[in-house]
Amino acid sequence: MQVMQPARLPHHYREMSSAEKEARIREAKAFFGNDLLIPGHHYQREDVIQFADFTGDSLQLAQLCGQTSSANIVFCGVHFMAETADMLTSREQHVILPDLAAGCSMADMASIAQTERAWEALTERFGDTILPLTYVNSTAEIKAFCGRHGGACVTSSNAKNMVQWAFAQKPRVMFLPDQHLGRNTAFALGIPLEKMAVWNPHTHELELLPGANIEEIIVILWKGHCSVHEKFTVEQIKNVRDRSPHTQVIVHPECTHEVVQAADKAGSTHYIIETLKQAEPGTSWAIGTEMNLVNRLAKQHPDKQVFSLHSTMCLCLTMNRIDLDHLAWSLDLLREGKRQFEITVAEDVAAEARTALARMLATV
């Protein structure tokens, strides 16, 4: 992927009041009209999400970007999302990420070199029996790898359907980069843990459960994780239930298998949002996902008790890098005809990655 290197944020943006920055953003939106689209992920901070033309999870935003005709897409999300937007839009459209440092630690846990080395070892061991699936929280190169080898992308919303689709193609699935989403999805489909193994890209070995038979392994999980969701624990669930037995616990499937099994419900951000919408007034919910979304849900549902499963949970730090300062600056530059924050995926990579994305979008 190619990105333009930005200069340091001009100091005067830090000195502006929030009202001044918000006014600049509104002026830019009015200036561009339909030629500007601002998609915002559910995990964005409140002062930024107010300017989103559309709010959604990874699947919804991917579909939106593939349908829009706006010339400029200023993506309030993280790096891999902006890459996906660029790959699903035309060459005449421009995708801007307000802060190029808004990455994803999970996506960085699977490099293309590591993945190709793993594939070589695994296909040597298992033959032509494996189909690769990648969570959309991955780099364009990993998506392209999956497209090249007959695989596809998945989101937390459609992971079950995509794993079922994969098993209709090959007897084994390689799921990367999030081991927890892969494990929880496979288990929900009835696959026992003993038939899953974890590929460690640092030791270049398959990690099996004690007593597991390597010949029976049908799900190969990449040793990656979300640094936010992995912080939720079974002990936190126990503490909530000890304090408030009537509270329901709902978590994201990027949490560990133990946490998902201990929770009352588990599902994507879209699932969590819809569950809260449909919940009866007066009900109590402990939510295991990113804090910006939890706080927003608490505000949107004053008739319910909504709080984080982890009372001192930090925000997704990279998602939180998209702030008013960077959004205002990127839009000011765009008005001057400067696309200093443009995300551009090389066409050879994009073509194969689009194949993986297209297989997903055709299946959901």
UniProtKB/Swiss-Prot annotation:
It is an enzyme of class 2 (transferase). It catalyses: iminosuccinate + dihydroxyacetone phosphate = quinolinate + phosphate + 2 H2O + H(+). Pfam families: NadA. [4Fe-4S] cluster binds at residues 104, 226, 316. Its main location: cytoplasm. Keywords: 4Fe-4S, Cytoplasm, Iron, Iron-sulfur, Metal-binding, Pyridine nucleotide biosynthesis, Transferase. Its cofactor is [4Fe-4S] cluster. Its EC number is 2.5.1.72. It is found in: Cytoplasm. It comes from the Bacteria. Iminosuccinate binds at residues 41, 58, 135-137, 156, 252-254, 269. GO terms for molecular function: 4 iron, 4 sulfur cluster binding; metal ion binding; quinolinate synthetase A activity. Pathway: Cofactor biosynthesis; NAD(+) biosynthesis; quinolinate from iminoaspartate: step 1/1. One of its GO terms (biological process) is 'de novo' NAD biosynthetic process from L-aspartate. InterPro entries: NadA, NadA_sf, Quinolinate_synth_A_type3. One of its GO terms (cellular component) is cytosol. Binds 1 [4Fe-4S] cluster per subunit. Gene3D superfamilies: NadA-like. Catalyzes the condensation of iminoaspartate with dihydroxyacetone phosphate to form quinolinate. Belongs to the quinolinate synthase family. Type 3 subfamily. This is Quinolinate synthase. The lineage of its organism: Bacteria, Bacillati, Bacillota, Bacilli, Bacillales.
